Amino acid sequence: MRVSDFYFDLPDELIARYPKPDRTASRLLQLNGENGEITHRTFADILDQIHEGDLLIFNNTRVIPARMFGRKASGGKVEVLVERILSDTRFLAHVRSSKAPKEGAELWLGEDKLGEHHGVKMIMVARHDTLFELEIAQKQTALLDVLQQIGHMPLPPYIDRPDEEADKERYQTVYNKVPGAVAAPTAGLHFDDALLAQLKAKGVNFAFVTLHVGAGTFQPVRVEQIEDHKMHAEYVEVPQEVCDAIIATKQAGKRVIAVGTTSVRSVESAALATEEKGEHALITPYFSDTSIFIYPGKTFRVVDCLITNFHLPESTLIMLVSAFAGYRHTMQAYQSAVENRYRFFSYGDAMFISKNPHVNGLD
């Protein structure tokens, strides 16, 4: 399959640069994956689509204020985006500057917030392909504390504006728990505490995985044939209680509903690893990196329904949705969303999709 198969025209004005005032006020396009039927709703209506005994899988990662601005020892400007925390004081990062810093180079970050000559000193330890390993010079200073002081929320490039104070709350799910992501699991942004309480009262079950979303999620697919694409690695935790909840839900004849593509990739990674180990369970605990790439023709072992935002043209995420709902149904749904002026991407509207049991490639 070609990357261009997943292209669609998107008017710039449909890219949401700010969230709706209320989380549940977003629109919801419901797609029946089996027959392609489309229904237009609001996100609050999802309460009627999720039933007693169904299991919602949430990603409880917390977005860290991962973007820092500063200068090199030479005085040149530098921008640093944390990709992965390695220890309290070391991390991997993307670095933007006129010249890439060399091993041993000093960076002074956060002067935009702390004042000139009051930045936090970082040392460039090593380079790993496109990523730089940096260390805080003051060993007793923890990275997460530094980021709270000087970091900016890492809004996606297509939002195309500086971060604002409100983004600290709105570019974060209400159930976030484990710090480490540099991009939000955006399907979860539509849930507020009241909706979660209503779902609980209805008898809907919750389970929480952790996938720390990396900046690689915004990288374009640079090959012509999608099968040649190599996914970036992200760290995943699928604990025993999640596996138990999934198995119990399946045994009861209820649905496993993934909130977001990161939840899909988490549980499907765990199920695939279980199968590859030859174990006789559907899914077993998983604490490791995943580079799983789900595109049309791939098998879903766990997930029955998917809640997700609208994704970029030619992205790995629209490929995942096409694998789940069927290519033709997915592209028709996206065309309908554009025609009906849905809002796209991280701060945009959502879809509720049931799995197409008949998909295989470009159906």
From Swiss-Prot:
UniProt catalytic activity: 7-aminomethyl-7-carbaguanosine(34) in tRNA + S-adenosyl-L-methionine = epoxyqueuosine(34) in tRNA + adenine + L-methionine + 2 H(+)
Quick one: a GO cellular component term?
Answer: cytoplasm
User: Where would you say this protein principally sits, based on its record?
Assistant: cytoplasm
* Pathway(s) this gene product operates in, as recorded in its UniProt entry: tRNA modification; tRNA-queuosine biosynthesis
* Keywords, alphabetical: Cytoplasm, Queuosine biosynthesis, S-adenosyl-L-methionine, Transferase
Concerning SUPFAM superfamilies, the annotation shows: QueA-like (SSF111337)
Alphabetically, the GO molecular function entries are:
S-adenosylmethionine:tRNA ribosyltransferase-isomerase activity
Q: What class of enzyme is it?
A: transferase
- Say which domain of life the source belongs to: Bacteria
The cellular location(s) given in this protein's UniProt record come to:
Cytoplasm
What are the GO BP annotations of this UniProt entry? queuosine biosynthetic process; tRNA wobble guanine modification
* Coiled coil spans: none
Q: What is its EC number?
A: 2.4.99.17
Record-linked PANTHER family: S-ADENOSYLMETHIONINE:TRNA RIBOSYLTRANSFERASE-ISOMERASE (PTHR30307:SF0)
Indicate the family of this protein.
Answer: Belongs to the QueA family.
Its quaternary structure? Monomer.
Q: What is this protein called?
A: S-adenosylmethionine:tRNA ribosyltransferase-isomerase
Species assigned in the record: Pasteurella multocida (strain Pm70)
- Recite the lineage of the species: Bacteria, Pseudomonadati, Pseudomonadota, Gammaproteobacteria, Pasteurellales
Its gene name is queA
